[in-house]
């Protein structure tokens, strides 16, 4: 909880920064605060079963890894003896636990129940963080006190915590909130701003805790934060604690005309401060001793010292264990290895690029400009090449391929980061793009080169088809001409036979045959049109026309003759050979003569 209403008092000092503000920083994280915050998001059974809080913790870590943040997780240790009454009072309110009547000693801390649900959540967070190369520092008592000590000793740049009493333990920069995703940000409070804008130093904040109430004291009932701040400022930051330790909280008294003293409503033996006496002597030695204990708990908390082996080990850097992380994510979230790699590997690659950029900037500061890929270079550039330009949430980025990073082919990184780390890669990419613009596209090349060949091949093919068509038509015309000549010869021979038999004695027999055929009613289909023994009398008048049925064979023969004539005419018009045209002309004249002779 921290100090009551202290965040409201510090509201004018609130600042919001984008997530990039955290890049290349070393931060301490109050692990209990983060897990309480993430667990409050959804307390349903499904959320607990699917470990939604642990997923949120994992995504926060990977976001900080991408920004090249060195993370130090700090967990709570034992409960301070001065905080035990407050802790039990909270448990009673939550679980309705009856008071056992045992008064704990003020100097004895209370070990936490390591088998509780929240302790199991902390263990899971430690496991998943260890696979990412992040170790957890187990505090002796309060985690925020340990974070504040590391920050005050400049072993970290800032602390993540929403317990406002972290400033009372000596923290300089505190991030209260963090938001990921689009437009991600952090909410920051700095002790320098608190001193400048509010006139409140660390001693003044401890005095406010005594007046307003905290985990270690109940404060003064009915005293508002505005009035408390005015009282503390009026005394001054340098002497406020001495005054409170020697005189108590008498400066916060509200005198009345009545001389009747009001007894404290809370027993002082339970480790918490009694309410301030409205009128009367407030220098009770027992109460003054309790005030001194609260001041000492804030000024000298039980923590690992900055030069201890425990702190040195927590500050050491460890590499993340890819295989172990895949196993843990499959156990906790049922993720396949590919999904775990998709989440973490791009962030690790971006962290490596930021470290390389820092190395480049340091070498530039000391005027040691080492060329890339040379033996003198301590590290190799992690970027293999730039693939294409991208824009993510309105920010210019590059999609790049990586060197020596198994499981990751390419990912997207900010363009300004690539420019700081390896500007020569950008130059190479621009030259490559300029060369592509000068040269025609591969598809256009294929079209331009293939169109002449296609057109030439089409011309050749059309010529071949025309040649074949001419050959076929010439062959057809020649065959049809030969057939027509044979038929004409047969008709001429028949014609001469018919003319020779005009005056023969069989004429009467022929007429009788016609009359008999008409009398019997036999159609033309039952007899051939021009039998060999039949004689046509061209001098005598033709017999009367009668309706006769025409056989199908005669119709087919007639249509066939018509087709032959058509073919002959078409072939005549399409032939270019002079000899062929001459023969065709002679054939037409011959056929015309035959038609005239038949008509006559």
UniProtKB/Swiss-Prot annotation:
Residues 2-97 are annotated as: XPG-N domain. Binds 2 magnesium ions per subunit. They probably participate in the reaction catalyzed by the enzyme. May bind an additional third magnesium ion after substrate binding. Mg(2+) 2 binds at residues 163, 165, 215. Residues 435-444 have a biased composition (Basic residues). Its cofactor is Mg(2+). Residues 130-218, 130-219 are annotated as: I-domain. Disruption phenotype: Normal sensitivity to DNA damaging agents. Mild UV sensitivity in the gen1 send1 double mutant. The double mutant mus81 send1 exhibits severe developmental defects (e.g. strong growth retardation and impaired leaf and shoot development), increased endoreduplication, slower cell cycle progression, spontaneous cell death and genome instability associated with a dramatic loss of telomeric repeats. InterPro entries: 5-3_exonuclease_C_sf, Chromo-like_dom_sf, Chromo/chromo_shadow_dom, PIN-like_dom_sf, XPG-I_dom, XPG/Rad2, XPG_DNA_repair_N. It is found in: Nucleus. It holds the Pfam family XPG_N. Residues 1-97 are annotated as: N-domain. Residues 433-458 are annotated as: Disordered. One of its GO terms (molecular function) is crossover junction DNA endonuclease activity. Its EC number is 3.1.-.-. The keyword DNA damage applies. CDD domains: H3TH_XPG-like, PIN_GEN1. One of its GO terms (cellular component) is nucleus. The keyword DNA damage applies. Changing residue 76 to A: Impaired nuclease activity. Belongs to the XPG/RAD2 endonuclease family. GEN subfamily. This is Single-strand DNA endonuclease 1. It comes from Arabidopsis thaliana.
């Amino acid at each position: 909880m921290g100090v009551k209403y202290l965040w409201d008092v510090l509201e004018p000092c609130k600042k919001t920064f984008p997530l990039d503000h955290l890049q290349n920083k070393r931060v301490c994280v109050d692990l209990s605060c983060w897990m309480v915050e993430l667990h409050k998001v959804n307390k349903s059974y499904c959320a607990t079963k699917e470990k939604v809080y642990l997923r949120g913790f994992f995504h926060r870590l990977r976001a900080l890894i991408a920004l090249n943040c060195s993370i130090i997780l700090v967990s709570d240790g034992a409960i301070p003896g001065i905080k035990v009454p407050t802790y039990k009072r909270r448990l009673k309110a939550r679980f309705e636990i009856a008071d056992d009547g045992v008064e704990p000693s003020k100097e004895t801390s209370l070990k936490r129940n390591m088998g509780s649900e929240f302790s199991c959540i902390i263990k899971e967070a430690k496991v998943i963080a260890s696979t990412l190369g992040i170790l957890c520092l187990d505090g002796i008592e309060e985690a925020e006190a340990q974070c504040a000590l590391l920050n005050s000793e400049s072993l970290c740049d800032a602390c993540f915590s929403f317990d406002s009493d972290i400033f009372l333990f000596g923290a300089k920069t505190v991030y209260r909130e963090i938001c990921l995703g689009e437009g991600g940000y952090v909410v920051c409070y700095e002790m320098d701003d608190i001193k400048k804008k509010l006139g409140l130093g660390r001693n003044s904040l401890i005095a406010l805790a005594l007046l307003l109430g905290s985990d270690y004291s109940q404060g003064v009932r009915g005293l508002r934060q505005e009035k408390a701040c005015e009282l503390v400022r009026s005394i001054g930051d340098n002497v406020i604690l001495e005054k409170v330790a020697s005189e108590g909280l008498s400066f916060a008294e509200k005198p009345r005309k009545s001389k009747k003293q009001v007894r404290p409503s809370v027993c002082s033996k339970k480790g918490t401060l009694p309410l301030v006496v409205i009128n009367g002597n407030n220098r009770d030695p027992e109460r003054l001793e309790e005030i001194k204990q609260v001041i000492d708990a804030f000024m000298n908390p039980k923590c690992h010292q900055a030069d201890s082996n425990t702190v040195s080990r927590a500050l050491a850097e460890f590499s993340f264990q890819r295989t172990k992380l895949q196993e843990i994510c499959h156990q906790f979230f049922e993720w396949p290895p590919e999904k775990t790699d998709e989440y973490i590997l791009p962030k690790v690659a971006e962290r490596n690029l930021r470290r390389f950029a820092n190395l480049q900037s340091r070498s530039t500061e000391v005027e040691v400009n080492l060329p890339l890929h040379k033996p003198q270079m301590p590290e190799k550039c992690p970027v293999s090449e730039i693939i294409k330009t991208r824009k993510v949430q309105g920010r210019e980025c590059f999609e790049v391929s990586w060197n020596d990073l198994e499981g990751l082919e390419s990912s997207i990184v900010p363009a300004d980061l690539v420019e700081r780390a390896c500007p020569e890669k950008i130059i190479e990419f621009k030259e490559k793009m300029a060369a592509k613009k000068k040269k025609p596209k591969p598809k256009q090349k294929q079209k331009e080169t293939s169109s002449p060949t296609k057109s030439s091949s089409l011309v050749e093919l059309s010529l071949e088809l025309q040649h074949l068509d001419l050959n076929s038509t010439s062959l057809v015309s020649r065959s049809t001409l030969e057939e027509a000549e044979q038929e004409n010869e047969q008709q001429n021979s028949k014609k001469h036979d018919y003319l020779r038999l005009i005056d023969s004695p069989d004429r009467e027999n022929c007429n009788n045959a016609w009359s008999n055929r008409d009398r019997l009613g036999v159609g033309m289909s039952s007899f051939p049109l021009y039998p060999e023994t039949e004689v046509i009398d061209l001098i005598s008048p033709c017999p009367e026309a009668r309706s006769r049925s025409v056989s199908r064979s005669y119709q087919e023969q007639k249509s066939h003759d018509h087709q032959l004539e058509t073919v002959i005419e078409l072939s005549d018009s399409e032939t270019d050979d002079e000899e062929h045209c001459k023969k065709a002309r002679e054939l037409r004249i011959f056929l015309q003569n035959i038609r005239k002779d038949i008509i006559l």
